[in-house]
Amino acid sequence: MSRVIVKGLPIYLTEPELQKHFNKRLITTHATSNVDGLITDLRILKNREGKSRRFAFIGYKNEQDALDAVNYFDGSFIYTSKIEVDMAKSFADPRVPKSMKEKKREALKRLREKEEKLLEEKNKKLKVQDTKSKINIDAEIEKDKQLKEFIETMKPSAQTSSWDKITETAEPESGLAEEQELDDEESSNVNPLLKHALSMKKGDENDSDDEYMSFNNADSKAGSDESNEEEKMISLSELPVQNEESSAEPKEDDGLAKNEEISDMDWIKQRRVRIRENGEKVGEEFATNVQDKESEENSQATPAEELQEEIPDEEQAIAKIQKTGRLFLRNILYSSTEDDFKKLFSPYGELKEVHVAVDTRTGNSKGFAYVLFAKPEEAVQAYIELDKQIFQGRLLHILAADEMKDHRLDEFDLKNMPLKKQRELKKKAAASKATFSWNSLYMNQDAVLGSVAAKLGVQKADLIDPENSNSAVKQALAEAHVIGDVRKYFETKGVDLTKFSNLKSPSQRDDRVILVKNFPFGTTREELGELFVPFGKLERLLMPPAGTIAIVQFRDIASGRSAFSKLAFKRFKGTVIYLEKGPKDCFTKAASNEDAMEHDEEKSAKEAGPSSADLLESVSSKKTEDKEDEDEQVVDGPTVSIFIKNLNFKTTSQQLTDRFKVFSGFVVAQVKTKPDPKQKNKVLSMGFGFVEFRTKEQATAVISAMDGTVIDGHKIQLKLSHRQGNAGSQEKKKAKNGKIIVKNLPFEATRKDVFELFNSFGQLKSVRVPKKFDKSARGFAFVEFVLPKEAENAMDQLQGVHLLGRRLVMQPAEQEAANAEEELERMTKKVRKQAAVSEIAAMTRNAGKRKLDMEDEEEEF
């Protein structure tokens, strides 16, 4: 957590005054007046009227600064107000109280669930009542034979069987007949004739058709008239008018029948009546009522829907992330880099791409980024755990991003292209994913010969004589000469060439730096600039006078990636240019205006070539650097490291930097850490660290001054560190006895070729090219110089040189044994090592077989 909350502020305090107050502590702890960027966010909360609510949030870039602010400012005073400073909590923290919107949303959710339950209970009760009423009607019909006969008579002929009309049986009817009767009974609610018949049944349940009725008595005329009226056939005109109006015709004449524009079908639709199973009628009035109810429900549900639209649905976001595996980050720090997000998200899984959006006009960040995971489930886990968490003093907001647009061709489109075009496209696609490089300073052999020929003032054909057998040696020596000139030029421009030999992983490469190789001799700096400038602003474009290689540095990462993907293996002046990403921090000084390249034709014309002043400046700088090298003994490599052990586990890199930056020549200080297995996104100190200085003398002076001092209660111990990456590898290349081994030698190379190649760098003592039993070369050779210094010079000058198309690899060889006993001891060690390796291989190879044998023996028993 790197965000703090400050309570109890004066109501009149402004944000600049609050930042100035907290910057005082940062200036003291960091011992510098430039503390810009350490406070990433500062906000005083205000009400609707614009008045301060007397508390604020302050975001720090480092967690250590936030903890220091809490310990230092908590309980202190600003003017006359006592403030409380504490670590802020994120929205995902369960201890944070819920907002009013969340409370309203939960209350609406509870009401909705309650309404659904009540509606379900009501529907269940209605179903029970309907079933009971149907059962009662069926029972009444079964009891009364006259009513049953009447219903059977009123059925359509298609629904009544012929034998049912002739014979009457007392057996129960089939399930199908019962369903038909039930339908007729339900329709009685709408049919007035059947409804009146049922009402008649209730009035004379005790009457019987078997008894005769007398009509002769005049006294009983009135009673007989009443009974006759009941037994008469009822005409439709005598039915109540109310039922007809309610069932068929509307209450008011809408005039639709007189309207000629309305068709017959539209008029029928307006008069259509639908009968439900429970006997309810649905016409115009019922439809309007339903529409009114639906409109009321929609009007009541509008606030809830608005709240749901304002708050993103987490389930929908997770479903989208599961499809794309891509996250959208916003509210990030404008100075955040891709490496910061790689460290944050890499613990959750493999990352395919991390992209920070950059404004191409200014080169500054836009404040949002994209992270693409290899597996979508890992992206979902990162979204759940990191959304609304504090990162670099700000609340990180993560959303589900759309799927990345892919403009690549599919296999079907590739098959329709020529084979040559297919190979070019595949090479371009694989160039950005390449994790290795054969030779960083690779140069086109034709360009090398052209450069040497132009420098000597001869024709290129004169350097290579087809009748001479040592043409390959001449070409290798010419390449060595050009490589030496290129090295000197890059060193004067502040390029650290040792970084190129230590590239082991893609994470060590910088997307902004591109090495341009394999372009023809005669290519100018302006022509390369026109090739790269359309993709973005160039901070550097370094091209040696030899004109065989160049280094391009873009202002932002996005421009470098775009240029690399579009220009890799592009045809340029009849050749294919090779691009390679350079290492990080390969420049030791800032870029000058002369090295930059802008998209301006007039300016580019003025910068056609290096002026005499530039050449004199480069020569003078070289002389001053040579004098400095003579005065100060700088170890092999750009810096000298000091190993510090017995550090307190609470000591941070910032505290170590504050302790050692007062010494001259200080470069950087770092405490080695490891991931915390208990808490994700946190690290633990390993109890030791490293401090780098520019020279060995400065490092030894610091060791004598600081060795044995106490930091955070621990007495530290200091000593020089021998790094395997830079210094260690350079020390191994020192030939103590003047003998070196040359590997990757072409099989066509002879002893004479090797002798002529190395003879120009010193006096040779012996040259040996081992051969097989068929007298063919084994691919390596031994070269021994009289002086060890000459051997080191040859290894340095011939580094990266090609002989007959193969790059030579040189290493110091072991010194020959002084006597037979030493030779026997070496052979014994070698045999022991080979025996141990073969024994381990046999054990691993036979482990599975022994397991199978044991299983077979167990089965026998």
Curated annotation (Swiss-Prot):
It comes from the Eukaryota. Residues 248-263 have a biased composition (Basic and acidic residues). The keyword Nucleus applies. Gene3D superfamilies: 3.30.70.330. Residues 2-90, 325-403, 512-584, 640-723, 738-815 form the RRM domain. Residues 176-187 have a biased composition (Acidic residues). Its main location: nucleus. GO terms for molecular function: mRNA binding; rRNA primary transcript binding. Residues 154-263, 283-313, 593-634 are annotated as: Disordered. One of its GO terms (cellular component) is nucleolus. It holds the Pfam family RRM_1. PROSITE patterns: RRM (PS50102). Keywords: Nucleus, Repeat, Ribonucleoprotein, RNA-binding, rRNA processing. It is found in: Nucleus. GO terms for biological process: endonucleolytic cleavage in 5'-ETS of tricistronic rRNA transcript (SSU-rRNA, 5.8S rRNA, LSU-rRNA); endonucleolytic cleavage in ITS1 to separate SSU-rRNA from 5.8S rRNA and LSU-rRNA from tricistronic rRNA transcript (SSU-rRNA, 5.8S rRNA, LSU-rRNA); endonucleolytic cleavage to generate mature 5'-end of SSU-rRNA from (SSU-rRNA, 5.8S rRNA, LSU-rRNA); small-subunit processome assembly. Belongs to the RRM MRD1 family. Involved in pre-rRNA processing. This is Multiple RNA-binding domain-containing protein 1. It comes from Candida glabrata (strain ATCC 2001 / BCRC 20586 / JCM 3761 / NBRC 0622 / NRRL Y-65 / CBS 138). The lineage of its organism: Eukaryota, Fungi, Dikarya, Ascomycota, Saccharomycotina.
